[in-house]
Amino acid sequence: MTTMLLLLVVAALANGQLTILPHEESQICFLQPDNPGFDFDGNFTNIFRDYASVKISSFTYKAQDADIVEILNVDRDRSCTILAIYIADSTLDFNTFLQSENECVKYAASKKHYIKLPRDREYFALAKNLSFCPLNDDLIGIYCDTQLETTYFSVARSSNYDVTDIPEFTELGYVFHSNDHFYICERKSEGNWIDYQLFYQNDAPLGTVSQRVNWGNVWSNVKTVAQMVYKILDIFFGKRNIEPRA
């Protein structure tokens, strides 16, 4: 988070000491699809920077063939005081990745990957057209041939990246295959790792592997990016007390 040159001076009159604390600038981050949206340049951002010491940053993500892990795996999100995401495609499951701590490993396309998934942990895949072959105690495929990916069982079959739970029923592991890169993720714990608000152009999804959805930061039927911008500013500055309607 950027530290401004402006310093707050706090005087402790009782003992005559003087403490100087740095004034930290808040940052509101907006993430929107790469198709034309809201113009964040110019006087609009200057208003809040000059008047309220708030930095407004805008970023875009690839709307087609969107990889949510790749979108969120950017250092910018860690410096945001609050992150607002505009989602035109409701199939993009941002909730799953923002509402819990997940550890994801990326695997290359068009290769067979042997992966062990302990049964006492919870795993899910972010993939499209992913298949797998579970192994028995002799490391032989269970009703599938590890050498022939055409005999594998389908985990995900979609033209977009989807979140799918993986049944952890064998200790010996699985062989995975996909023609596209994919992720195997372990859910480590429940809880937001960033203060965020989701704005869906249409109806909001429930979240594929989330145990529960925090409807307090999910908004639906937000037709324009501009509506998101003014709503998140309203939330940030606390001018009104209006509950989201998901």
Curated annotation (Swiss-Prot):
Compartment list: Virion; Host endoplasmic reticulum lumen
Presence of the UniProt keyword Calcium in the record: yes
Disulphide bond pairs: none
InterPro entries, A to Z: Rotavirus_VP7, VP7
Source superkingdom: Viruses
A GO molecular-function descriptor: metal ion binding
UniProtKB keywords: Calcium, Capsid protein, Disulfide bond, Glycoprotein, Host endoplasmic reticulum, Host-virus interaction, Metal-binding, Outer capsid protein, Signal, T=13 icosahedral capsid protein, Virion
Signal sequence region: 1-16
GO CC, one annotated term: T=13 icosahedral viral capsid
Complex and partners: Homotrimer; disulfide-linked. 2 Ca(2+) ions bound at each subunit interface in the trimer hold the trimer together. Interacts with the intermediate capsid protein VP6. Interacts with the outer capsid protein VP5*.
Family: Belongs to the rotavirus VP7 family.
Its job: Calcium-binding protein that interacts with rotavirus cell receptors once the initial attachment by VP4 has been achieved. Rotavirus attachment and entry into the host cell probably involves multiple sequential contacts between the outer capsid proteins VP4 and VP7, and the cell receptors. Following entry into the host cell, low intracellular or intravesicular Ca(2+) concentration probably causes the calcium-stabilized VP7 trimers to dissociate from the virion. This step is probably necessary for the membrane-disrupting entry step and the release of VP4, which is locked onto the virion by VP7.
HAMAP family: Rota_VP7 (MF_04130)
Protein's name in the database: Outer capsid glycoprotein VP7
Taxonomic path: Viruses, Riboviria, Orthornavirae, Duplornaviricota, Resentoviricetes
